[in-house]
Amino acid sequence: MDTEKNPTKESDWQRELAERSRAVFLVRGLLGCACPEEIFDHYQVRQHVIASLPVVELIMGDRLLVWIMDGNKVAEPGQTLGQFLKAGLEERERRGLNRFRLVVVGDFLSWEQQWTHLADALDPRVHLHVLPKIVA
């Protein structure tokens, strides 16, 4: 895996998702969330580092936490995804939100089938998604 850090990709995601229509497309269109329309009236998007990996974080209303990460930066998927899912669950609980979705971006579509059991074992409101891309 390429572990070189490239903040440009995360910056692009953050900029794109700051547009409401892009956030709606990601959450509803790509992730399949049936969230009510009002959560899109108040959402935050920011970039930060978790366990030395850059992520883009979306907090949608008072309901949904989404972390987006570049799969190319994940050296050990089983271990890393497990850590991120657990940390996301803890953050969701700390903030009093309803759901957490970890989104891995890149050509790793087999990871969703291979590692989704990690999310299932934690909580039915924790989800793992693997997408080839999140913005056009």
Predicted regions and their residues:
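A short, well-structured beta->alpha microelement
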Residues: 41-63, 72, 79-92, 133
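Amphipathic protein-protein interaction modules
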Residues: 69-119
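Generic marker of "main functional regions" within proteins
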Residues: 36-41, 45, 49-50, 76, ...
